A protein has these predicted regions:
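N-terminal leader/targeting and pre-domain segments
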Residues: 1-19, 91-122, 205
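Local sequence-structure signature of Cys/Sec-based thiol-disulfide redox active-site neighborhoods
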Residues: 3-46, 117-158, 220
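Structural micro-motif
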Residues: 20, 62-81, 165-182
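N-terminal non-catalytic structural scaffold regions of very large proteins
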Residues: 37-90, 105-109, 113
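General detector of folded, globular domains
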Residues: 45-49, 69, 141-149, 153-158, ...
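Thiol-based oxidoreductase modules, predominantly thioredoxin-like and allied folds used
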Residues: 52-64, 152-166
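Non-catalytic, surface beta->alpha helical segment in thiol-disulfide oxidoreductase systems
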Residues: 72-106, 180-210
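Beta1/beta-strand and adjacent pyrophosphate-binding region of the FAD-binding site
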Residues: 211-224
Length: 224
């Protein structure tokens, strides 16, 4: 899967990994020949990555709602990042960054933004539908992956529409990146971490406002 240039590049990057990483595959076991082929390529890719660093290993296969897919995990950590498909093409950089960040390499963002991500409350399950030729998709994928590293309440799966065509068609997705949150259409187009966080804050503020409006009236409301 990796040519000599990519292998050399990735090996150099993996030297910056500080913590152990386990790549956990969820292989496809059905009758779709295309998915079976991509599942085999996924297994090959994971093995090639693990061979480049003693801090990276391939775990036992597990079931998942999307196959083929794989999770990038850190033992003892709740970090939840998954690629459903092969993150090559424009998404190879997303894969490299995810490996580094799950492996303990610092997320490169403004400290105020990092602190704000860490302060996000509640569980948030994001899914980004992307394609390997999409130029705007990596910005979204990388932002949500980094947020999932920074905050265990945030979970992210990047879905390659070319692999999971049935899911894309069922949702009527016509353009990528398409972002879903907790199963609902949440946004589309290029968004960086700050824009995603701003949108999350707006949703949280609206939810709190609606919750307050549904409560019984207060005799006295003390603010401060």
């Amino acid at each position: 899967m990796l040519d000599n240039a990519l292998t050399t590049q990735l090996k150099t990057y993996l030297e910056m990994v500080r913590e152990p990483i386990v790549l956990v595959p969820s292989p496809y076991r059905g009758d779709d020949a295309a998915k079976s082929s991509k599942s085999a390529h996924m297994d090959e890719l994971l093995s090639e990555i693990a061979a480049l660093s003693d801090k990276v290993s391939v775990g036992k296969p597990v079931d998942n709602e999307r196959t083929p897919s794989f999770a990038i995990t850190r033992p003892g950590s709740p970090i939840d990042i998954r690629f459903a498909g092969l993150p090559m093409g424009h998404e190879f950089t997303s894969l490299v960054l995810a490996l580094l960040q799950v492996g303990g390499h610092p997320v490169k963002e403004e400290q105020s933004l990092i602190d704000a991500v860490r302060a996000v409350k509640g569980e948030h399950h994001f899914v980004t539908y992307m394609s390997l030729t999409c130029q705007n998709c990596p910005t979204v994928v990388q932002a949500l992956n980094a947020m999932a590293v920074l905050n265990p309440n945030i979970h992210h799966t990047a879905v390659d529409g070319g692999t999971h065509t049935d899911e894309v068609e069922a949702k009527g997705i016509a353009s990528v990146p398409a972002i879903y949150l907790d199963g609902e259409d949440w946004g589309s187009g290029r968004m960086d971490m700050a824009e995603i966080l701003e949108r999350l804050d707006a949703d949280a503020a609206q939810g709190a406002k609606e919750d307050l409006s549904q409560r019984d009236p207060y005799d006295v409301l003390v603010v401060g």
